[in-house]
Amino acid sequence: MAKRSLSSLSAADLRSKRVLVRVDFNVPLNENGAITDDTRIRAALPTINDLIDKGARVILSAHFGRPKGQINEGMRLTPVAKRLSELLGKTVIKTESCVGSDAEAKVNAMADGDVVLLENVRFFSEEEKNDANFAQKLAALADAYVNDAFGAAHRAHASTEGVTKFLNPSVAGHLMEKELQYLQGAIDDPKRPLAAIVGGSKVSSKIGVLEALIDKCDKVLIGGGMIFTFYKARGLSVGKSLVEEDKLELAKELEAKAKAKGVQLLLPTDVVLADDFSPDANSQTVSIDAIPDGWMGLDIGPDSINLFQDALADCQTVIWNGPMGVFEFDKFAAGTNAIATTLADLSGKGCCTIIGGGDSVAAVEKAGLAEKMSHISTGGGASLELLEGKVLPGVAALDDA
């Protein structure tokens, strides 16, 4: 179902209007409380700047960390307000609380084009309970609603879902619109062949995604720690590699399902082993049927990289979610880096490359290739749920186009 977006609202619609914008500002901080990666703040700028240009009064709502419904001084949005002020080139006023007299006074004092950042909504337990009274208090600050927090769209919270019952219009921001366009588009109407690369350490966290992707894709490539559950299910010995014993039957079923559907399901043919889980462990590369006892697999090997590159060469759409190995250790990052480089090359040849959230985004950024990809998703859980074909409450609640 297509959703109405901010693009459909003109300056005449928005001038002097108070617009509540849900953003995803859940950024990492270092021990000194400084922001170490402002990607999520920058991702919201197109929506914020568009609203400023159209003369709206911009009221930003965000969560930060998990304060569990209580005020936590270390989880205030003060560093975010400071960084956003720098990026916008204008002062962003932060409130003491997201609802109540201070928020009301600061919103009432706004002029057209001003930006106010409401304090962490999760300081109130009512936020995650999607409490209607709390949602109404948030909504009372504004005349219209924009949801640009794709990363929180899979949660039915007061600021992502509840407020839409009290604000009209309720529309998708530019980032949300782009996320839906790419991720939904890749699933519903992709240019084919469509391939998915799924990595990460556990099959259990990707079951729904793997099942959905086997239904929709022409090729599914699997890497990361989860491959050892598949190998063990095939009867291979995996040394002391990570295995989910309770998922062996599922691994067999997934392979059988792919075969029955004529989907190419590719697993690595060789792996890079370590004698210990550490950056300077001893390592060796072996075929998957020759893993010795006492060793664990921490990356895919060079033959597997070639196999995966060949499989991807003719693809028109590629979705990547999850690293191929323990890329945080340089010695075991070759597989992940090779996939990042391959996708960057494919993008240059007109392939639509989508990096679906989480660790793969970090890997692509670490390799300096983020700009080369068609789309980098800002959602972790939200991306996975959308790829699984689930309805995201924060999206469903918006006005239909």
UniProtKB/Swiss-Prot annotation:
It holds the Pfam family PGK. InterPro entries: Phosphoglycerate_kinase, Phosphoglycerate_kinase_CS, Phosphoglycerate_kinase_N, Phosphoglycerate_kinase_sf. GO terms for biological process: gluconeogenesis; glycolytic process. Disulfide bonds: none annotated. Its EC number is 2.7.2.3. PANTHER family: PHOSPHOGLYCERATE KINASE (PTHR11406), PHOSPHOGLYCERATE KINASE 1, CHLOROPLASTIC-RELATED (PTHR11406:SF23). Monomer. This is Phosphoglycerate kinase. It comes from Prochlorococcus marinus (strain MIT 9303). The gene is pgk.
